[in-house]
Amino acid sequence: MSGRGKGGKVKAKAKSRSSRAGLQFPVGRIHRLLRKGNYGERVGAGAPVYLAAVMEYLAAEVLELAGNAARDNKKTRIIPRHLQLAIRNDEELNKLLSGVTIAQGGVLPNIQAVLLPKKTESKKA
């Protein structure tokens, strides 16, 4: 007997796939949802990590801009109006979410130039 195979190795503490990837979004849950959602017969190991990273980036981007909008309005809490202002004022996010309606979001303040009063020139004698 060489003594191999019996004990010896201590099992390492479980580390989530989210923490391995350095993400906050749940990689395991996204993997489960991809499998259960009939998106394909099989789901690769990298797919949920990539998707979680993309979702986390988009969420961080929207929250950053919405936080700025809230601060501009002297508020400490982000409301749907701030989300609407953040998304519609950003060209790329507006294109991505063009078909999305945000409840209680309101509209962007916009007045067509032709509707503004004409500027009268002061006549000099």
From Swiss-Prot:
Entry keywords, A to Z: Acetylation, Chromosome, DNA-binding, Isopeptide bond, Nucleosome core, Nucleus, Phosphoprotein, Ubl conjugation
Modified residues (N-acetylserine): S2
Composition-biased stretches (Basic residues): 1-18
Record-linked SMART domains: H2A
Cross-link (Glycyl lysine isopeptide (Lys-Gly) (interchain with G-Cter in ubiquitin)): K119
Listed InterPro entries: Histone-fold, Histone_H2A, Histone_H2A/H2B/H3, Histone_H2A_C, Histone_H2A_CS
Reported modifications of this chain: Monoubiquitination of Lys-119 gives a specific tag for epigenetic transcriptional repression.
UniProt-listed SUPFAM superfamilies: Histone-fold
Pfam families assigned to the protein according to its UniProt record, in alphabetical order: Histone, Histone_H2A_C
A GO term for molecular function: structural constituent of chromatin
Function, in words: Core component of nucleosome. Nucleosomes wrap and compact DNA into chromatin, limiting DNA accessibility to the cellular machineries which require DNA as a template. Histones thereby play a central role in transcription regulation, DNA repair, DNA replication and chromosomal stability. DNA accessibility is regulated via a complex set of post-translational modifications of histones, also called histone code, and nucleosome remodeling.
Similarity remark: Belongs to the histone H2A family.
The name this protein goes by in its record: Histone H2A
Species name: Chironomus thummi thummi (Midge)
